[in-house]
Curated annotation (Swiss-Prot):
It holds the Pfam family GIDA. It comes from Oceanobacillus iheyensis (strain DSM 14371 / CIP 107618 / JCM 11309 / KCTC 3954 / HTE831). Homodimer. Heterotetramer of two MnmE and two MnmG subunits. This is tRNA uridine 5-carboxymethylaminomethyl modification enzyme MnmG. Belongs to the MnmG family. PROSITE patterns: GIDA_1, GIDA_2. The gene is mnmG. One of its GO terms (molecular function) is flavin adenine dinucleotide binding. SMART domains: GIDA_assoc_3 (SM01228). One of its GO terms (cellular component) is cytosol. The keyword Repeat does not apply.
Length: 629
């Protein structure tokens, strides 16, 4: 018999990277929130790599922070190394990456959760959903506790019917030998959800004392590290380096000789693995012309000797892993502390979701994170934040929030998932964003902080600082457009020292800054303004001026896209009644049920001719409706 254990506005199932963002956002918005987790000691656990950020992913962390989420704040307090990547390239692909101290990250996140006013945290295994009249009303745990809520968010990561694979060894488990969730997955199937099976893997961890670092290349952090969070004021300067080494022909021989022993290649593994984070077995088979592959040695924290062997994800037997490790320069005497393994798990086919991350089949039920077919902590956190905001909005009778593809990488990811689906673990890449010049590391706050403020996730004090920054940027651009720089000898000397061609005539400071050789500080030196502006404001002014033409073109593309997004598709549309649309397109449209013509145009199998017919049909319906009115 179940018992009523409490009533809430929002219940979050799981406390990984999606779960903590969901719970925190919902609670901050004023929703009475419950977060249930299998193990209170594993909140925000990092089961795989000890890092946050990187290309596209680092920008997602900035977006989370700009909206009022917490991943950026917590990693800023717990990193052992911080690096800005792609600094030699344009601002659209620059991204921050932090090496995390795993135990400290978890400790900081748990502290934040425990001290959030509207948030209750409980340890417990959720076995089934409470469904009444086709609407999700809560959850039931294995201890028969029934918790009721207006909205439920499931963020189970890789725990649903998780199975660990290593050679011929196979056993039910979540990451790091945690308990696995069986009944919740079965319950979702009972309610008609289409479930798929994915796989991910992790490499061995070795003892730092047994590594010969003299045979590797040092990878230090930045001298002046930047922050993920706009609220961080102090940086950690006591950084720990990572180290680079490589596989070789001997490593590849060991792997090739034992491929049939890998659960990846022996037929044991049924789940689809990640294309962009392949196992070492997969790399050797797919890229057999490559003589070597990079291996990064990444410390897992300040107070542990465990070192993560980035690049050697494997499901080979433990005995072969020892052999493989010892073939790598610097690791000849390395001792494995934890062996690598693959893990298979259940995921929900994401085309069953609305762009709010609420499920189409069960109103009131949301899903976020790896359960939706993604890979990576950052992708999970971004979805968790949006699911939390929308679940709270539903409970509090507020408008839902849907970020479009021009607003955020988070918007790109969610649109890809719910519109196109994915047949492998989805990873965010800069190439997935058609408007990536607008979705930069430096401007996440300008894109999203107004939204975070409107939904109650940004404090008044922070919003005041943000509006002042916006004003300073606009005022400085206006000021530079009014200042004329004449070609005096002093100015020509500055130009030559900067490697720029001499001025032929007087020019506005604004136009001069468009020259690639001239930074904001160089132009500022010419006009001797001595203004006290923050580095963030200077950076933003320079980028907006230098890339003005490209940004303008990108915004024109966005305007065209938004016209298609504004053409809403009626909820009761009958696709079978539309003459001329291809059969495959009708099937896909009925399955995805797009909200707009723009979303319909991005569905695989729906071609431009189908979109044109759909547009005409909708417009004719609108005309008929007006005539009848």
């Amino acid at each position: 018999m179940t018992y009523n254990a409490g009533n809430y506005d929002v219940i979050v199932v799981g406390a990984g990277h999606a779960g903590v963002e969901s719970a925190y956002a919902a609670a901050r918005m004023g929703a009475k929130t419950l977060m249930l987790t299998l193990n209170l000691d594993m909140i925000a656990f990092m089961p795989c790599n000890p890092s946050i950020g990187g290309p596209a992913k680092g920008i997602v962390v900035r977006e989370i922070d700009a909206l009022g989420g917490i991943m950026g704040k917590v990693i800023d307090k717990s990193y052992i190394q911080m690096r800005m990547l792609n600094t030699g390239k344009g601002p659209a692909v620059q991204a921050l990456r932090a090496q995390a101290d795993k135990p400290i990250y978890m400790k900081e996140m748990k502290h934040l959760m425990e001290n959030e006013e509207n948030l209750t945290i409980r340890q417990g295994m959720v076995n089934e959903l409470i469904v009444e009249d086709g609407i999700c009303k809560g959850v039931i745990t294995e201890t028969h506790a029934a918790y009721y809520a207006d909205s439920v968010i499931v963020t189970t990561g890789t725990f649903m019917r998780g199975k660990v694979l290593m050679g011929d060894l196979e056993y039910e488990s979540g990451p790091n030998n945690q308990r696995v969730s069986i009944k919740l997955s079965e319950d979702l199937e009972k309610h008609g959800f289409e479930i798929t099976r994915f796989k991910t893997g992790t490499p061995p961890r070795v003892n730092s004392h047994t590594i010969d670092y003299s045979k590797t290349e040092i990878q230090p952090g930045d001298d002046n590290p930047k922050s993920f969070s706009y609220e961080t004021t102090e940086q950690i300067t006591d950084q720990i380096p990572c180290w680079l080494t490589y596989t070789n022909e001997f490593t590849h021989q060991v792997i090739n000789d034992n491929l049939e022993l890998s659960s990846m290649y022996s037929g044991m593994k049924r789940g689809t693995g990640p294309r962009y984070c392949p196992s070492i077995e997969d790399k050797i088979v797919r890229f057999n012309d490559k003589p070597r592959h990079q291996i990064f040695l990444e410390p897992e924290g300040r107070d542990t000797e465990e070192v993560y062997v980035q690049g050697l994800s494997t499901s080979l037997p433990e005995s072969i892993q020892h052999e493989m490790i010892k073939s790598v320069p610097g690791l000849e005497k390395a001792e494995i502390m934890r062996a690598g393994y693959a893990i298979e798990y259940d995921a929900v086919v994401p085309t069953q979701l609305w762009p709010t991350l609420e499920t189409k089949r069960l109103p009131g039920l949301f899903t976020a994170g790896q359960i939706n077919g993604t890979s990576g902590y950052e992708e999970a956190a971004g979805q968790g934040l949006m699911a939390g905001m929308n679940a709270a909005a539903k409970s509090l009778n507020k408008e839902p929030i849907i970020l479009d593809r021009s607003q955020a990488y988070i918007g790109v990811m969610i649109d890809d998932l719910v519109t196109k689906g994915t047949n492998e673990p989805y990873r965010l890449l800069t190439s997935r964003a058609e408007y990536r010049l607008l979705l930069r590391h430096d401007n996440a706050d300008l894109r999203l902080t107004d939204i975070g403020y409107d939904y109650g996730l940004i404090t008044e004090e922070r919003y005041q600082r943000f509006t002042e920054k916006k004003q300073q940027i606009e005022q400085e651009k206006k000021r530079l457009s009014k200042i004329i720089i004449k070609p005096t000898e002093d100015i020509q000397d500055i130009m030559e020292k900067a490697g720029a061609s001499r001025l032929k005539e007087a020019i506005k400071a604004y136009d001069l800054m468009k020259r690639p050789e001239l930074s904001y500080d160089i132009v500022d030196q010419m006009i001797e303004s001595n203004l006290e502006l923050s580095e963030e404001v200077k950076e933003q002014v320079a980028i907006q001026i230098k890339y003005e033409g490209y940004i303008k073109k990108a915004k024109e593309q966005v305007d065209r896209m938004l016209k298609m997004e504004d053409k809403k598709i009626p909820e009761d549309i009958d696709y079978d009644a539309i003459n001329g649309i291809a059969t495959e397109a009708v099937e896909k449209l009925k399955k995805v049920r797009p909200l707009s013509v723009g979303q319909a145009s991005r569905i695989s199998g729906v071609n431009p001719a189908d979109v044109s017919i759909l547009l005409v049909y909708i417009e004719q319906g609108s005309i008929a409706k007006v005539a009848n009115d």
